[in-house]
A protein has these predicted regions:
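Conserved catalytic cores of phosphodiester-cleaving nucleases, focusing on short active-site segments
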Residues: 56, 79, 99-117, 128
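Nuclease catalytic cores
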Residues: 37-45, 57-61, 65, 69
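A short acidic/basic microdomain associated with nuclease active sites
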Residues: 75-88
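Short, low-complexity, charge-dense intrinsically disordered segments
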Residues: 1-34
């Protein structure tokens, strides 16, 4: 092994510096999913899959929001629709966002009806998470042949 290469061995696994980075990241992700109510996100994704399976793609976001609300209500999930999120700067209001659905005051849902989930969609969800103070969110895209979803957590 070259002198400048650093390696660590744990049990039978050997990690170089890059491997250690990924192990630490994996541990952070595990903590995130333990802190977030994973059951709620699983239930929401299941409801979204049922809506997409029955309706298919091609409708407006509002139609999917209405259908998902019906399905969440049937499953007994506590949620709010079209929640206004105020953005402040030095105590002064500077704008607001409208979140599609907030589930159980811990998970923000952003519904899309696009070809695929893009970078601006992810940025929008992160901005909503900052404005709301919620720890995690889901982008649910009903616009493709199969339901796309992306879990995201507030990093700051």
């Amino acid at each position: 092994m070259p002198a400048n290469e650093r390696r660590w061995q744990t049990g039978t696994l050997v990690f170089d510096q890059v491997g250690v980075f990924f192990v630490r990241r994996l541990r952070r992700l595990r903590r995130f999913f333990k802190s977030m109510n994973y059951e709620i996100s699983r239930k929401v994704i299941g409801c979204a899959m049922k809506v997409h399976r029955e309706m298919g793609c091609g409708f407006l976001e509002r139609v999917y929001e209405n259908a998902l609300s019906i399905e969440l209500r049937r499953k007994g999930v506590d949620f709010e629709r079209q929640v206004s999120l105020r953005v402040h700067y030095n105590g002064e209001p500077v704008g607001h966002y409208i979140a599609d659905i907030i589930v159980g005051n811990e998970l923000l849902l952003e519904l899309k009806a696009l070809q695929s989930i893009t970078g601006p969609c992810k940025s929008q969800l992160l901005n909503y998470l900052k404005a709301s103070g919620l720890p995690a969110g889901l982008i649910l895209n009903f616009g493709s042949k199969s339901l796309e979803f992306k879990r995201m957590a507030k990093t700051q």
